[in-house]
């Protein structure tokens, strides 16, 4: 029986030392610190640091330039993340288009996990680019956490891996949710 489950669980050390978070803004105002603070909390669990804050206008050209700069300044083992000021709702939206404009590619758009379904995963100059869904502004568990945990350990994440996360992917009423959603019966 032991042979049947060999390899079912594997512990892998964190290989990333640092992550870069690029935020976009819709107006001239800098976005609230809520999203960055939530990501600092997530990265602290892994002993990782977050690079200094980078906020750019929510435009493809501006974000593409910031992505190119981040790729030039980031070791290949580290992670680039994008948190947009407006929801990334399709593969042609500003953030995925900026990854392509910067010379990268989008490997997966969307995931069958809620919250977190508007995530995208890309690659730029050999580095992963994680497009964070809006729910990443909250410290509550979401689908981006499942992808982040693998990426920071240097585990390649494929489109098929993300698709497989749909089994058990409804995270709405997890025990750690600070305020449970109301049910229709109430």
Language-model segments: residues:
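Electropositive, gly/pro-rich neighborhoods at or near active sites that engage anionic ligands
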Residues: 1-3
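Glycine-rich phosphate/diphosphate-binding loop of Rossmann-like nucleotide-binding domains
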Residues: 5-58, 62
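Short glycine/threonine-rich loop/turn motifs
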Residues: 34, 51-185
């Amino acid at each position: 029986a032991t042979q049947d489950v060999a390899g079912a669980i594997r512990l892998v050390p964190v290989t990333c030392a640092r992550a870069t978070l690029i935020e976009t803004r819709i107006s001239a105002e800098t976005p609230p610190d809520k999203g960055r603070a939530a990501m600092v909390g997530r990265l602290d669990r892994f002993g990782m640091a977050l690079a200094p804050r980078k906020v750019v206008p929510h435009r493809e050209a501006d974000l593409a330039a910031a992505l190119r700069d981040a790729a030039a300044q980031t070791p290949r083992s580290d992670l680039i993340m994008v948190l947009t000021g407006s929801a990334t709702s399709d593969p042609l939206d500003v953030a995925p288009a900026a990854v392509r404009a910067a010379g990268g590619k989008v490997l997966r758009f969307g995931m069958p996990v809620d919250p977190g379904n508007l995530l995208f995963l890309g690659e730029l100059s050999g580095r992963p680019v994680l497009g964070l869904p809006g729910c990443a502004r909250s410290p509550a568990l979401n689908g981006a956490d499942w992808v982040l945990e693998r990426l920071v350990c240097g585990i390649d994440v494929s489109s098929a891996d993300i698709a497989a996360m749909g089994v058990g992917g409804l995270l709405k009423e997890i025990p750690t949710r600070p305020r449970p959603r109301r049910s229709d019966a109430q």
